[in-house]
């Protein structure tokens, strides 16, 4: 399921969802528009990880080739495999290159703008990654967020709201 419109976010909120994960392809302007249309809805935004050659929630290659649904969190990352490009005459134009692999998303320098646009939490891709990768990426984002929180008291860490 990809969530990229205010109407879809509003529908999910009214159906009982209490946070909505937005499609990773959205721009700052699109995130802000959704937030302005649905200010009561907490919005989770992808900030780090793979970008799909398809739109989020619209890839069926993994399911067709490997029986693993990307739309259920089981992407086989077919687009990350090397391919050769051969013309109609059989001539190899490109051999064993990552033709479908996009650059990974890294929004670490845009965290403050994402907060200003209405993001309430951030999603770092960790599925199918090893523990040290997830630990290091999360720590780097944590440092950047802590620096923002120190400068911008209007942003409060969710954990600081929990009282035991």
Language-model features: where?
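Catalytic alpha/beta core domains of metabolic enzymes, predominantly
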Residues: 1-128, 134-137, 144-149
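Carbohydrate-binding surfaces of carbohydrate-active enzymes
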Residues: 146-159
């Amino acid at each position: 399921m990809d969530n990229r419109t205010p109407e879809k976010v509003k529908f999910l909120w009214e159906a009982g969802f209490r946070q909505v994960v937005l499609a990773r392809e959205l721009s700052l302007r699109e995130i802000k528009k959704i937030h302005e249309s649905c200010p009561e809805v907490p919005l989770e935004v992808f900030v780090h990880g793979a970008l799909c050659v398809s739109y989020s929630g619209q890839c069926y290659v993994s399911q067709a080739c490997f029986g693993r649904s990307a739309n259920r969190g089981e992407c086989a990352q077919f687009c990350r495999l090397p391919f050769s490009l051969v013309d109609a005459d059989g001539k190899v134009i490109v051999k064993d290159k990552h033709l479908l692999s996009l650059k990974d998303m890294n929004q670490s320098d845009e965290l403050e703008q994402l907060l200003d646009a209405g993001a309430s939490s951030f999603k770092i891709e960790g599925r199918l990654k090893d523990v040290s990768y997830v630990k290091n990426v999360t720590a780097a984002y944590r440092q950047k967020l802590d620096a923002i929180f120190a400068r911008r008291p209007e942003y409060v860490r969710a954990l600081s709201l929990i009282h035991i």
